[in-house]
Amino acid sequence: MINTNNYRIIAKRVISSATSALETLSNNIPSDFNRIIEFLLSFKGRIILTGIGKSGYIARKIAASFSSTGMPSFYLHPAEASHGDLGMITRNDLVMMLSNSGETKELFNIIEYCNNSSIKIAAMTMNKNSTLAKRSDFLLKIPECQEASLIGTPTISSLIMLSLGDAIMTVIHEERGFTRDDFKIYHPGGTIGANLTKIKNIMRSGDEIPLVYEDTSFTETIIIMNKKRLGCTLVTDKEQNLIGIITDGDLRRNIHDQIHLKTASSIMTKNPHYISSEIFAQEALNLMKAKNITNIPIVDDNIIIGIIHIHDLLSMGVS
């Protein structure tokens, strides 16, 4: 019989090893870390990432993260570099090389080219005495660690490299004041792009807004709500100030023999929640979930300018 409990034991061993390695990295930030940060903060060129094997995949991810936060970056395959793509590297670039051993032969031609062309190199390696470390301008020495896999498959070393790359990226964009608005420019697609969409760009506005006045009759209120098909209407004064909201539930609670005497102001919920047009879609969704509401008005300078339904947000992938 298969001992399935062993699966969890192995999983815990791997995760425990990863946790321990990250703690070691946190306590042993590379001595050149501040130097590379100061350099990159004033850097105007491109950051070229390179590495082979698993280090190459980590390099690709770091390059993608740099680019998405406003630092032009791309991945250069070492083999392609040796067959003509070295011409993609200019004197204004920084080449960041990833190699656990620092003796990856496929990187040597790139090292030689950069050294001969006065192109700066940042080395991410475990071996401070390696060829790569000795011939680099910035040494990002990562802690020596044992892989979680019993056969030595890159696991922990890959995680450490990725984490250090993410740390560099995060420090740079925070120090530069890179905002979520900036991030949206470089990442308009997917869930991230949807979450970072400003409400003003997706709200219902103009004639799409269900509006009634304080003295609008119960019957007319029902007609307007049915026409706009949002399950609610906003209540406004003559200056377009928001004073209340009426939902389908409010209507049901007020249906009785005296409905012909009812006006919007007598059945509305006063002081409803509202948001600014400048907030992000994700913030709006979180508020609506927290308050258990399906519609929320958008108000700027005390004036109603729009409304958003929770389904509008969910349908565009906001989460």
Swiss-Prot record:
Domain CBS: 203-263, 268-319
InterPro entries (UniProt xref): CBS_dom, CBS_dom_sf, GutQ/KpsF_isomerases, KdsD/KpsF-type, SIS_dom, SIS_dom_sf, SIS_Kpsf
A Pfam entry, by short name: CBS
GO terms assigned for molecular function: ATP binding; isomerase activity
Protein name: Uncharacterized protein RP505
Record's keyword terms, sorted: ATP-binding, CBS domain, Nucleotide-binding, Repeat
UniProt xrefs under SUPFAM superfamilies: SIS domain
Superkingdom of origin: Bacteria
Domain SIS: 36-178
Residue positions binding ATP: G51, I52, G53, K54, S55, G56
Residue ranges of the TM segments: none
Biological process per Gene Ontology, one example term: carbohydrate derivative metabolic process
Family: Belongs to the SIS family. GutQ/KpsF subfamily.
